[in-house]
């Protein structure tokens, strides 16, 4: 069974799909459980007689009652009774499987009057576990004894615990074994001797490569064919190109690739493949442990593997691949050595000890703008004896005692000097190929120190010049310099000791800079504490538990130093294939071995099948509107330079309890009414068990005499952070009535605007001030229609829960032409909106109510959303950005260069944006949708959804109409809100918007760079577009702007702007009560870790404090950032936010 729980309460009050009765063979009413069942479902005893050791299903009074007859141990032997008890439970399990019952309430059989006077709780419980493990039902065990409850709970806990066989073994379930030459060696979570041998390497730069390699192995089941494709992938071929070569359309879910295929230097690990691919390598070497087809593959050379790994569970500890040997005494003790290596080749390559050369360095300065910082692969240690060469000024971090700075600002003339070497280590060096150049690592200079401290990342310094290194062969290497003093005499350095390596030099030369041409991993970028389930798709993120609102794959960045236009290419999706037989097979596997991995595989297949069925249903329902896919208009999208930010320096406390206390101290100092807020849990939730109530929009009546029982049981963890944020609303009658009573829509308009004239002016302003004037004719000639591809793409991209909801809604589907598009449903929003402040303690939390559109309208028409977004991005001016399909990193790349200290930024906050959209704005939206090319047939449907709303006054039956307003949760809500947001900015700002270097819009949120408000802006909004607007003038670095739940801050170290989450909002959210049994804390912790890493950037710390003090007028914000970093460090720390479980209404006494 997926889950076992125990409850100490009356079984007749259960909420499960079926109940098991501890019956007797005659089918008559007895005592205990039998009497409770008879009292609640009296008809269930008709024809209930069944022999001992069997069970019988009776459906009565709307309930599935399973009568199971256990043995009476007073009348049978122990062995016979034990057999019959097991048989009774097996019979119950058989009925559950045959009837597809998903949850069952069950007592322990033969533990009461049939127990023969002995304690048979554990005996009965073991048989129950054995039988129920073969079912797919959630099992709730009911008892009335406190000692029994404790025993059963301990037994359930033991089933989920991990037992250590030996005391010597340390439990490291998330340890991953990596290649000895991997850069992950020594980092937490990775080992060269122990751990899992298959992983997607989540949280590293090699994750995407690992996922791609796993997909290739799935597309080509034959190992040699898959390896051939992996070689082509390493040589630069794209995944799309590889997928098109696959002979079959669909493939199974992938499994993680090997992390250690072998121990030789040519092991084709995800890390090596990633580096080869990143360096645009044209020829690679693979070893024999990576089998390939017999024929030759261009650019791939095969060698014999000299260190085959036999996968044994007890791996001997490996000898370090490096052995340091003493060097011969140098005659020039005061000369500096800078190493260059001749022998290189694969991503694993190390310098050979026979190829070290001594270089004499002469400084000579050249001035020009550098490209990107050079790779820093091997550190040449240079000890300075005569003078301190370099001084780094204006450092924003504590200076470490050992600082390493690249010597770039020099033209280095290399003279080869023979190194004294014993014949034991002298190896022949193959002649270098003419086409390639010897790589020279970037030399570094080290300041000598008498003591050691932990290293601190050095800040980036703006570069002003470039230099080159010239070898005796006349080959130049460009190096990008950092801030460096010009030297007037040669630098004398000491030769580094040679290193013995356990392999032969490799006969391949790699271009300088081959190793790391992409940006470096910054300290704090990777969370090595991530919990990996062991397969893709293990986490389905929600907004609170995953990376925030802007979470997508980065698609708007590139490694070039300037903005470039690219042809917009749709990400290819693979339609789900229906395979019910495989779903049943995976379900059976999961039942036999109920591990997380098996459960995940089964759920993935189940969701795929659901999606396939949904697509067929929707295509069938929309067939009168369905058309062939027309040729898409090519559009272009800008990509921006990948920004560089200062490194994160961890600043946290040791004790998480101190961190919680620091959060509460901050709240007490800045929000005293919040910290001291007290509320009684059992306030007034009794209205949800009322009989005979009459509920209307404006009143509710009931009879207090008809109160039947306590409210439903509600349990939650008492929050330790005292931010007094209420938990989500319970779906009780009282709250639903409050919601129904609250929804007093704006039934009268403030005044009648000239609807048509206003809409035409809105559209003209939009096209004049926010658009580039292209594409309108092409859009008109190529209308957007519902196509098979639209529907398929939309459904394929749905996450599991959304797919399940749509699957339920499309059952007995109404055709699109019969969907009532003008209908909307008043729905209750369960979550309480969290805003930092005291409002939530000064008044009772109000139930938020939304007007949801007809679900089927959303299901049919969501398919056109992607094409609408693509077209809108194509027509908008290059300075205006919408955040659709964009990651947080993409947004950072867009704003990085534009937002500088002292720049003015305009924020506008529109009150009740959805409700304020009247007829003129609805018409504006329809006209713009028509201009973007939406087909006339679809426009008719959308017009019905956007138009006037018809309502009925329930007490009198009076029908009335009121003006249009946007319905939340509709198929185009976010798109149209964003469109109208830009329209309003165009009407009010006009040329100021056009001339702004950067403006961003999403929904009702916007920021416009370089604009200051004037006294008429708010009045124009009120009179021209009927919107009540609050205008905020922000200034970078003084009062930083706020957008999308975060601040736009300026990184003082790198000179780039970025958006970071609001720490105060995050702190308030940590005080939200969590329902008992929630299992998403690891996701929440990881999401918080990502945010704390950004807050810890060296160049942002002071900026963040300015932002919080200017926006919220609070002090001591450094303490809460430090406290949240402590809580995010580990799951154990994060759990300190959760106090004891509070039970309301009917919990354990």
Curated annotation (Swiss-Prot):
PROSITE patterns, sorted: MACRO, RDRP_SSRNA_POS
Keyword Membrane recorded: yes
Residues marked Cleavage (site): 538-539
Binding site for Zn(2+): 262, 264, 287, 305
Short motif FGDF, span: 512-515, 523-526
Any one of the GO BP annotations: DNA-templated transcription
Lineage: superkingdom: Viruses
Note on how the cofactor is bound: For nsP4 adenylyltransferase activity; Mn(2+) supports catalysis at 60% of the levels observed with Mg(2+).
UniProt modification remark: Polyprotein P1234: Specific enzymatic cleavages in vivo yield mature proteins. The processing of the polyprotein is temporally regulated. In early stages (1.7 hpi), P1234 is first cleaved in trans through its nsP2 protease activity, releasing P123' and nsP4, which associate to form the early replication complex. At the same time, P1234 is also cut at the nsP1/nsP2 site early in infection but with lower efficiency.
Any Pfam family: nsP3_ZBD
UniProtKB keywords: Host cytoplasmic vesicle, Host membrane, Hydrolase, Membrane, Metal-binding, Nucleotide-binding, Nucleotidyltransferase, Phosphoprotein, RNA-binding, RNA-directed RNA polymerase, Transferase, Ubl conjugation, Viral RNA replication, Zinc
Domain RdRp catalytic: 903-1018
Binding-site residues, ADP-D-ribose: 10, 24, 32, 112-114
Residues where Phosphothreonine is found: 344
GO cellular component: host cell cytoplasmic vesicle membrane; membrane
Cofactor(s) annotated in UniProt: Mg(2+); Mn(2+)
Any GO MF annotation of the entry: RNA-directed RNA polymerase activity
Catalytic activity, reaction form: RNA(n) + a ribonucleoside 5'-triphosphate = RNA(n+1) + diphosphate; 4-O-(ADP-D-ribosyl)-L-aspartyl-[protein] + H2O = L-aspartyl-[protein] + ADP-D-ribose + H(+); 5-O-(ADP-D-ribosyl)-L-glutamyl-[protein] + H2O = L-glutamyl-[protein] + ADP-D-ribose + H(+); RNA(n) + ATP = RNA(n)-3'-adenine ribonucleotide + diphosphate
EC number(s) given by UniProt: 3.1.3.84, 2.7.7.19, 2.7.7.48
Disulphide-bonded residues: none
Note: Viral replication produces dsRNA in the late phase of infection, resulting in a strong activation of host EIF2AK2/PKR, leading to almost complete phosphorylation of EIF2A. This inactivates completely cellular translation initiation, resulting shutoff of host proteins synthesis. However, phosphorylation of EIF2A is probably not the only mechanism responsible for the host translation shutoff. The viral translation can still occur normally because it relies on a hairpin structure in the coding region of sgRNA and is EIF2A-, EIF2D-, EIF4G- EIF4A-independent. The genome codes for P123, but readthrough of a terminator codon UGA occurs between the codons for Phe-531 and Leu-533 giving rise to P1234. P1234 is cleaved quickly by nsP2 into P123' and nsP4. Further processing of p123' gives nsP1, nsP2 and nsP3' which is 6 amino acids longer than nsP3 since the cleavage site is after the readthrough. This unusual molecular mechanism ensures that few nsP4 are produced compared to other non-structural proteins. Mutant viruses with no alternative termination site grow significantly slower than wild-type virus.
Identification of the protein by name: Polyprotein nsP1234
Originating organism: Ross river virus (strain T48)
């Amino acid at each position: 069974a997926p889950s076992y729980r125990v409850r100490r309460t009356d079984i007749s009050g259960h909420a499960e799909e079926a109940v098991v009765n501890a019956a007797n063979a005659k089918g008559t009413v007895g005592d205990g459980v039998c009497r409770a069942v008879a009292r609640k479902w009296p008809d269930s005893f008709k024809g209930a007689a069944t022999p001992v050791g069997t069970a019988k299903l009776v459906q009565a009074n709307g309930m599935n009652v399973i009568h199971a007859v256990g043995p009476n141990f007073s009348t049978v032997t122990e062995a016979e009774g034990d057999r019959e008890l097991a048989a009774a439970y097996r019979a119950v399990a058989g009925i559950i499987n045959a009837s597809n019952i998903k949850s069952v309430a069950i007592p322990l059989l033969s533990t009461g009057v049939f127990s023969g006077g002995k304690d048979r709780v554990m005996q009965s419980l073991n048989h129950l576990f054995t039988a129920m493990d073969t079912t797919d039902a959630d099992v709730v065990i009911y008892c009335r004894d406190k000692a029994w409850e404790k025993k059963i709970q301990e037994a359930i806990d033991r089933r989920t615990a991990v037992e250590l066989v030996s005391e010597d073994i340390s439990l490291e379930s998330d340890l991953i074994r990596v290649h000895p030459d991997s850069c992950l060696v020594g980092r937490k979570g990775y080992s060269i001797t122990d751990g899992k041998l298959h992983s997607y390497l989540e949280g590293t730069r090699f994750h995407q490569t690992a996922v791609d390699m796993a997909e290739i192995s799935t597309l080509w089941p034959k190992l040699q064919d898959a390896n051939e494709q992996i070689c082509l992938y390493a040589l630069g071929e794209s995944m799309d190109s590889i997928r098109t070569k696959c002979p079959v359309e669909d493939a199974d879910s992938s499994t993680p690739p090997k992390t250690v295929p072998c121990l030789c230097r040519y092991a084709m690990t995800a890390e090596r493949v990633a580096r080869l691919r990143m360096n645009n390598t044209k020829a690679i070497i693979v070893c024999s442990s990576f089998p390939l087809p017999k024929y030759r593959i261009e650019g791939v050379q095969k060698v014999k593997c000299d260190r085959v790994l036999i996968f044994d569970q007890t791996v001997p500890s490996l000898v370090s691949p490096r052995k340091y040997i003493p060097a011969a005494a140098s005659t020039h003790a005061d000369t500096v050595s800078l190493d260059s290596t001749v022998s290189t080749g694969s991503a694993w390559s190390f310098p050979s000890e026979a190829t070290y050369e001594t270089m004499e360095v002469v400084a000579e300065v050249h001035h020009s703008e550098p490209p990107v910082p050079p790779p820093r692969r091997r550190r040449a240690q240079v000890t300075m004896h005569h003078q301190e060469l370099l001084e780094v000024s204006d450092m924003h971090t504590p200076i470490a005692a050992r600082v390493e700075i690249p010597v770039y600002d020099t033209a280095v003339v290399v003279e080869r000097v023979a190194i004294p070497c014993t014949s034991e280590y002298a190896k022949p060096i193959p002649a270098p190929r003419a086409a390639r150049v010897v790589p020279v690592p970037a030399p570094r200079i080290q300041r000598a120190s008498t003591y050691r401290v932990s290293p601190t990342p050095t800040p980036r310094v703006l570069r002003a010049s470039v230099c080159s290194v010239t070898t005796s062969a006349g080959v130049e290497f460009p190096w990008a310099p950092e801030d460096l003093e010009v030297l007037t005499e040669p630098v004398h350095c000491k030769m580094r000791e040679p290193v013995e390596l356990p392999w032969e030099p490799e006969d391949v030369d790699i271009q300088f800079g081959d190793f790391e041409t992409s940006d470096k991993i910054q300290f704090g970028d990777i969370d090595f504490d991530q919990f990996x389930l062991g397969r893709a798709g293990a986490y389905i993120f929600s907004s609170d538990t995953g990376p925030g609102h802007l979470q997508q794959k980065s698609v708007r960045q590139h490694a070039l130093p300037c903005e470039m236009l690219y042809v917009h290419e749709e990400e290819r999706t693979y339609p789900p294939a229906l395979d019910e037989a495989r779903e049943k097979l995976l379900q059976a596997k999961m039942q036999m071995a109920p591990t997380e991995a098996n459960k995940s595989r089964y759920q993935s297949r189940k969701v795929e099948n659901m999606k396939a069925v949904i697509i067929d249903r929707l295509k069938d329902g929309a067939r009168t509107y369905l058309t062939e896919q027309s040729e898409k208009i090519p559009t272009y999208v800008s990509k921006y330079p990948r920004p560089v930010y200062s490194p994160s320096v961890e600043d946290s406390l040791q004790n998480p309890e101190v961190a919680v206390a620091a959060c509460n101290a901050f709240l007490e100092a800045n929000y005293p009414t919040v910290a001291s807020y007290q509320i009684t849990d059992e306030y007034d939730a009794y209205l949800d068990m009322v009989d005979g109530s009459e509920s209307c929009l404006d009143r509710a009546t009931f009879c207090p005499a008809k109160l039947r029982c306590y409210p439903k049981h509600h349990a939650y963890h008492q929050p330790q952070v005292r931010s007094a944020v209420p938990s989500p609303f319970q779906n009780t009658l009282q709250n639903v009535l409050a919601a129904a009573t609250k929804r007093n829509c704006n039934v009268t308009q403030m005044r009648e605007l000239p609807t048509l004239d206003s809409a035409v002016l809105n559209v003209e302003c939009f096209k004049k001030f926010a658009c580039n004037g292209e594409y309108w004719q092409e859009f008109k000639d190529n209308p957007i229609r519902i196509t098979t591809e639209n529907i398929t793409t939309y459904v394929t991209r749905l996450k599991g829960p959304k797919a399940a909801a749509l699957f339920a809604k499309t059952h007995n589907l109404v055709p699109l032409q019969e969907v009532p598009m003008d209908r909307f449903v008043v729905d209750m929003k369960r979550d309480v909106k969290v805003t930092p402040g005291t409002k939530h303690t000064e008044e009772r939390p109000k139930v938020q109510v939304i007007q949801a559109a007809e679900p089927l309208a959303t299901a049919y028409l969501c398919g056109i959303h992607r094409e609408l977004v693509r077209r809108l991005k194509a027509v908008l001016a290059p300075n205006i950005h919408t955040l659709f399909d964009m990651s947080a990193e993409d947004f950072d790349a867009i704003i990085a260069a534009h937002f500088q200290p002292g720049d003015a930024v305009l924020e506008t906050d529109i009150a009740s944006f959805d409700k304020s959209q009247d007829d003129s704005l609805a018409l504006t939206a329809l006209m713009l949708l028509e201009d973007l090319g939406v087909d006339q047939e679809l426009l008719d449907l959308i017009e019905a959804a956007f138009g006037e709303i018809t309502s009925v006054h329930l007490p009198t039956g009076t029908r009335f109409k009121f003006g249009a307003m946007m319905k939340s949760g509709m198929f185009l809500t976010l798109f149209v809100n964003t469109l109208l947001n830009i329209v309003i900015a165009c009407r009010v700002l006009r040329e100021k918007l056009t001339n702004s270097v950067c403006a961003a819009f999403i929904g009702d949120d916007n920021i416009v760079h370089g604009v200051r408000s004037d006294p008429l802006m708010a009045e124009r909004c009120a009179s021209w577009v009927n919107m009540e607007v609050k205008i905020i003038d922000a200034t970078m670095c003084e009062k930083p702007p706020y957008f999308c739940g975060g601040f736009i801050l300026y990184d003082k170290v790198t000179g780039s702007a970025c958006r970071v989450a609001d720490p105060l909002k995050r702190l308030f959210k940590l005080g939200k009560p969590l329902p008992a049994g929630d299992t998403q804390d690891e996701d929440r912790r990881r999401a918080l870790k990502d945010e704390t890493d950004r807050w810890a950037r060296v160049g942002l710390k002071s900026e963040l404090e300015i932002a919080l003090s200017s926006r919220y007028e609070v002090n001591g914000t450094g303490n809460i950032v430090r406290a949240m970093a402590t809580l995010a460090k580990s799951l154990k720390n994060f759990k300190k936010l959760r106090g004891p479980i509070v039970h309301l209404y009917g919990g354990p006494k």
